[in-house]
């Protein structure tokens, strides 16, 4: 069973960087982020329909789902600002270092113990993160504000993951994902629109990328959905 969980988590970790990579490379990362959440919501609804699962079963854990959705809003605000101001290869490992945060919180407050294979997997992730961010003559401490934003993104994502892990003990992963995405997508759209460049048209700023790079938008959403679904299945 633990090997199955490790395989799900590892596959999820391999897929997940595609979302941030495509968002960072897109000339309009806010629009790409919004597109990803629209794709997630659609895929989750289709997945639930195919599986014959009632999306309204979320009422059993509505407070957890609402908190998770608000956490997603905060995560993307912190993460997008981090990727805009800092080097992606340096700060992505920090924003995605939530397994360490989860392990510490679970051990200290939830009394959870982890097996050797899971601890080994976390250690491998952080060894890889070190080599990703390492650059001779340069350090992440050179941008303290960006570093703080990256750490905040990591903490928020860790809290969201803990809430989602609790949620999928009651409902199916696609149900949780659908409502979390639906809760977050509209507030994020409003926030992105209010903070757009002064010379940017709101519709073009938020949705113009669907005309310019529809393939990358679909890739962002689909890869992230599969990644997060596998992670929730592991829980």
Each language-model region and where it sits:
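Membrane-interface interhelical linkers
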Residues: 1-70, 74-86, 134-149, 182-235
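Hydrophobic core positions of alpha-helical segments in small-molecule transporters
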Residues: 11, 35, 67, 94-97, ...
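Transmembrane alpha-helical cores of Major Facilitator Superfamily
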Residues: 93, 97-100, 151, 182-185
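Hydrophobic alpha-helical transmembrane segments in multi-pass integral membrane proteins
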Residues: 43-55, 102-118, 155-171, 220-235
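Hydrophobic transmembrane alpha-helices of multi-pass small-molecule transport proteins
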Residues: 38-44, 104-107, 117-135
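Short, charge-rich binding segments
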Residues: 80-85, 92-94, 107-108
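Small-residue-rich transmembrane alpha-helices that serve as helix-helix interface/gating elements
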Residues: 123, 178-185
